Amino acid sequence: MSDFDSSNFDFFKYKPDYAKIAEAAFSRLSFTFTKEHLENVIKAALAPDASENDKYVCSCILKNAEVAAKGKFPLCQDTGIANIFGWNNGSIIPEDISNQLTKGTAKIYDEKKLRFSTSCPSSFYEEFDPKNNMPAQISIFTNGAALAPTPSFAEKAPKGSLSLLFCAKGGGSSNKTSFIQGTKAFLTKERFTNLIKEQLGKFGTSACPPYTIAIVAGGLSPEQNLLTLKLATMGAYSDMTHTPNKDVFRDSELEEIAMQIARDSGYGAQFGGSRFALETVVIRLPRHGASCPISFGVSCSAHRNLRAVVTNNGFYLEKTVSNPAELEGFSEATRPANEKSEKSGGNELHLNTENGIAALLASLKAAKPGDRVLLSGKILVARDAAHARWQKLIDAGNKLPEYTTKYPICYAGPARTPEGEVIGSFGPTTAGRMDVYAESLMSRGAALITLAKGNRSQPWTDACAKYGAVYLGTPGGIAALIANEYIRGQEIIDYEDLGMEAVRLVDVENLPCFVITDSLGNDFYKQIAEKSKK
């Protein structure tokens, strides 16, 4: 046989059908996590040095997993670009394997009401929604001729098999990838440690920590370095040796250093604390003497990766947890979110949008950056494409739609609505992408209260101080929970052709938020960054 350990896999016995394999993989990973990932989140929630906000966010992430595991609401509203990597160990694979994998993937995105996130070009500047989330990113390698190091599970797979790694990669975490075409000068402990501090500080919170952080130094080419990074964020190298050698290894000391830097950053699990990372992976590769590629990347808290091994007799698919509540520590770890439910009262500021923006802003004057708010009432939901259209109206000398000034604006694009439900999985998108519109909108009375995730730029913060605006951060990574517990209704009111980016009015009840930027321009994340430097 081989060294392949099948104990963590389910086996499906029938002739290999790559469309069905893709269906099974993306159906499983879109709604359930592996036991290892859930245990890491539980550990973070129960860590002695976790802040109250760390505990609360991790608690919500775990409750989100419990809701999603029922199979109706996907784990995240951004159900991601479908990534499939394969390593062939002597298997005879069909010529149309990419077409088969694509067919199965597209079927699940359609049938499971997963979000269609891809934009395809109709010209260099114009785009359209293909309404199937395709194309998928598919790369199949021969074990001995892979661009990046072959994962150990693929190396140990039976002869005549094909190993596959499936991933749903969201835009927020992909956008955190950074690449430096460095030199040997970076390869000292002091210089590399300083580089880690610099790059981890740039991650911020908009990709939904706690993160799996990967760092890769070396590589015979930029593309080898970056593919190794991508696979590292997917957990492909969990069994890689930590013993230095000429080919590839993980560095234990730098992983500990990176984890400590993550703790000390102060960002925590989104709203201040120590749980910025669940795991760090630092990999060293060979390099050309004249260059040293270095890359940094993350996988978000919606860590959706799944392994499969296909043989002539059937296929093995990595197990996930169908009932997270049965895991040891789950009940204790989810207590903070349960205790801070709407029934508990608590110290949160309760606000309702029915009295208008001016009344909301007046109420928010009592809140400090970092304070928690429970928001009820109607909010406007709009993101990149809608903002671009509003800007076109302004540029053409036209007025903004009246709705832009009547409600708080939440940047989000929900997953498609499951049958019998009010809305699909719903969570915030990255705030910073809309910062360019600060002056255009606020000067016209719009975007005076916004909801999103992550840190914002100085121009946005300055605009908040100038116009008395407030930015509220909504927890990321809990989209199934938000759709299931905090949303009462929705309607599309404009730009229906934009699909998931259409403008909506969404009715929320006790939606949890945190004050990030107040009306004086005080910024929560800037305060954290300044504190971490002391």
Q: Can you say where each PLM-predicted feature lies in the sequence?
A:
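Short acidic/polar capping segments at secondary-structure boundaries
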Residues: G144-A145, K169-S173, G219-L220, N455-S457, ...
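C-terminal binding/interaction regions
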Residues: G273-T280, R287-H288, N484-K534
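Short, solvent-exposed amphipathic alpha-helical segments in soluble enzyme
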Residues: G182, T228-A232, S295-S299, N312-G314, ...
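Short, well-ordered loop/turn sites that connect or cap secondary structure elements
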Residues: L364-A367, V373
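Generic structural signal for buried aliphatic residues
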Residues: V373-L375, I379
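Non-transmembrane, aqueous-exposed alpha-helical and coiled segments at domain scale
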Residues: M1-I215, L220-G345, G424, M442
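Feature captures the catalytic cores and cofactor-binding loops of soluble hydro-lyases/lyases
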Residues: A236-A262, G266, Q270, V381-L511
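Short, structured beta-strand/loop micro-motifs enriched in basic residues and often containing a Trp
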Residues: N347-A359
